[in-house]
Amino acid sequence: MPVDVEAVVLSNTRLPGGYSVLELRAPELASLAAPGQFVMVRASHCDAPLLRRPYSIFDLVRDADGRASGFTLLNKRVGVGSGLLYEAAPGARFCCLGPLGRPFTLAAPPVEAWMVAGGVGLAPFATLAPALAGRGVAATLFYGGRTSADIFCLDRFEPHGVRVVIA
């Protein structure tokens, strides 16, 4: 069941090419999230943009006890809404509705998985990679971008044994 929460920005890491990784504290939402799900996000402090924007959950943040305490979003600054996320400072608040969408389902027993992504399309696979590794699945990520600035965060996949192919 989705929840509507006000998430607090803990950090905002800028990446090349106008990308950023936003870490949000929202334990009630994070504890319900599964690989492949997304949230609808809107700035709490303003009416523009009027509509929420969908963002795949990039990663789950865990506290010292291993409980999900928040999540990260992968963002590319393009318009007003993504610009607000890109400029967000620690302590900023965003309205988040989620988790939404059907999580990834794994065939039983999966032997091999291929993931194909480019740019921010990488986000849902960051939570899938450890789930695949935990089931002993050999995974390959085919990843592309328009420029070298669109290739990032590959370090999130290597610890899980994911073979990365840059297209």
Model region roles, listed by residue range:
Residues 80-167:
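FNR/FR-type flavoprotein reductase catalytic core
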Residues 2-90:
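Ferredoxin-reductase
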